[in-house]
Amino acid sequence: KDFLKINCQLDELEKTLNNFIYKNQLNKTVFKDLSSLKNLSRLNSKITFSTNFGRDIEYYSGVVFEIYSSSNKEIARGGRYDGLLKNLGSDKNISAVGAAINLNNLKI
């Protein structure tokens, strides 16, 4: 329940997750995939990390994301879809990342 309350800026993510891990006596390797997100903090953008996505995300298998403009309009959303094709009947288990871009909210 507390995990779904995590909401922080990307540069605070490591500290926030470490506090959560310590408080809940978890193994740190649970969040090893999230460490690669630290590289995104080099971008000159405000990036917020939240564990409460608020959508039906059963077909996602890993990190799920949403990208918003400075005026709070959704620009894109997506995530990892490992195993989705196999669940849909494929003989192969294919790893994938996908996103949908909302072209109406892009400024050109």
Predicted segment positions?
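Positively charged, Gly/Ser-enriched RNA/tRNA-binding surfaces
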Residues: 1-108
